Amino acid sequence: MSFDHLLTSSKRRELLQNLGIGHGSDVFSTGLFRKAECNAETAISQRSIPRANPDHLRPIFDRFATKEIKGKKLMTPEDFIRGYLGLYTEENYNKETVRLLASAADTTKDGDISFEEFCAFEALLCSPDALYLTAFELFDRNASDTISCDEFEAVIRHTQPLHDQDFDFSSEFIKRYFGADKQRNVNYHSFCQLLHDFYEEQGIQAFKRYDKNGNGTISSLDFQQIMTTVKGHLLTDFVRHNLIAVSGGGASGHKFSDTRGGFVTFPYYAAFNSLLAKMELIKRVYVSTTRGNLDIEMTKEEFLHAIQSYTQVTPYEVEILFHLSELNHPGRKTLCLKDIQAIDPERLKRVSQMDRLINIKAVHHKDDRGVGTAFLESAYRFLLGSVAGACGATAVYPIDLVKTRMQNQRTSGSFVGEVMYKNSLDCFKKVVKFEGLLGLYRGLLPQIVGVAPEKAIKLTMNDYMRDKFTKDGKIPLYGEIIAGGTGGMCQVVFTNPLEIVKIRLQTAGEVQQAGKKIGVFTVLKELGFLGLYKGSRACFLRDIPFSAIYFPAYAHAKLASADEDGMNSPGTLFASAFIAGVPAAGLVTPADVIKTRLQVAARAGQTTYNGVIDCARKLIKEEGPMSLWKGTAARVCRSSPQFAVTLLTYEVLQRLFYVDFAGSRPTGSELATTKTIQDESSTNPDHVGGYKLAAATFSGIEHKFGLFLPKFETSK
């Protein structure tokens, strides 16, 4: 919807008419209704929740409407608020509050809600500024499209803060909005600004009331009284319980010059309230600076540097913020997400760029994690790692076969026809020519069976060890290296037996033996149990350095390629995993060559090797130092895409099949953002369309604007 023109109150009601009733209705042409035109198609694009079909709303309305006049069903305020929305269901509910809330839907202000009004309010709740529109309807008591001073005062005096702290409705603040004689009415946009500024003015008046000497100071107890009555909607339990301590009236050792001796100056009072009102901005600065890593703790100096581009936040407010943070964890002068959430009642939610196929919250809080939860988390990672490993291995298996053939090719000795392949491309062509396309996948089954647990245990152990080394959201480089190396070491117990079987099958096609078909069981019978671990030292020599190089490189590549919110798209995940594989695969090629020579079955006339050192010595002596780097290109071309596919699949699966164990998540997989009103939508099947947000909207009016309405009738 275009807002190039001023959205006046009358135009707003026109929008409600067209959205709520549809074409052909003349209901809004009678009585106190205003009628006009609206581009409903453009309005639809602005709604964050789909509109309900009036045909679906009709039976719902008829079921809850208990009043009937001349054959037309109507909802009373009690029908709408208590019956349909399920609010204020207590026996001693405040009747004026229920009537006032229902008046938001009662466009004619006649005390009842018709079906047309019911539909119109559903449309209003779908609009982007539903919070302010609903508040405007609460104050517009005579359906005039404007708010008079008397209307504003009547509603404000019914709110809970005015029961505890009076307000001067003859002040200059009120006169600036309603005129010196208070006879000027305000329209919708002016009302929005009035509502925004009112509670700041109310706080100033409350301060003046307690500042009896007029010297700009109040006591800590007076400060607590003002904050709990006038500013109660800004307080969490943590802040409410620490008001005396933070204002210098308690035992806290941290005292500001403006809060010494149990007194609070107006600058401190203003900065404190301003900070609470800006907590949403504080949260955004923290999330942006930490690049989505919500476990990082920031120092005051780091935070001051981060807010340099935000002129709205003053150093005084930051000082108060870190004082509150220190009260949350005495002895540590840092700021973390827990501190922000202790100060700000609005919670962050974590969202992914992908729609989750599964969304399970296994643990509601990190403190609830136990041994069983940690085990389930590792099992979850192991399962996804197995699938990811199988995908990665299948994708690059032909390259792996070429690499193995090239590394096993001898370039010296008397064996006739030993040099079969000129290079990797020649090897690929000859395999396809003499063994067919399926020859490129010879030995794939044991490879998949092996790679599934191999990659799973490597990924799981790396994640597990990274969790152990991570403190305050940060992990040192040596911790990353040890975590990666541990993952590589643990995988060898799975890798070695399956690698040797894979290599025997991959090289079996080079020289065919008449009448002898070589399969998995043939190789197992020939090797025996101990033979399956032949060359295990070379496996350790290859896999530990590879993982110690790969995982830190991958983590840093992800961080470098993340967007400003710390998010990694599938493209950057693949690129990061691919790039990390180049140095990791290339630098450990000598160990891979030695492992291959030890595990392959030597044919008649070929050199045999007795261990890692003997193999390395004979290779250098017989084939030259460069023989240790045979197949480097093929290995890099195989390992880089394999791990790129594996890590991409592993992280994407964690996003699609989301299970929250209250532990660490892969960096860059989630964006931390504030919960919106849509996150509080009703699950009641009768609450369709905009009515999913009705209760959350009324609650938002209370907590955003401080319009706390009394729930119960007061005794006379």
UniProtKB/Swiss-Prot annotation:
Disulfide bonds: none annotated. Keywords: Calcium, Membrane, Metal-binding, Mitochondrion, Mitochondrion inner membrane, Repeat, Transmembrane, Transmembrane helix, Transport. Residues 346-362 are annotated as: Linker loop domain. Ca(2+) 3 binds at D211, N213, N215, T217, D222. It holds the Pfam family Mito_carr. SUPFAM superfamilies: EF-hand (SSF47473), Mitochondrial carrier (SSF103506). Residues 93-121, 127-162, 165-195, 198-233 form the EF-hand domain. InterPro entries: EF-hand-dom_pair, EF_Hand_1_Ca_BS, EF_hand_dom, Mit_carrier, Mito_Solute_Carrier, Mitochondrial_sb/sol_carrier, Mt_carrier_dom_sf. Upon calcium binding, the EF-hand-containing regulatory N-terminal domain binds to the C-terminal domain, opening a vestibule which allows the substrates to be translocated through the carrier domain. In the absence of calcium, the linker loop domain may close the vestibule, which may prevent substrates from entering the carrier domain. This is Probable calcium-binding mitochondrial carrier K02F3.2.
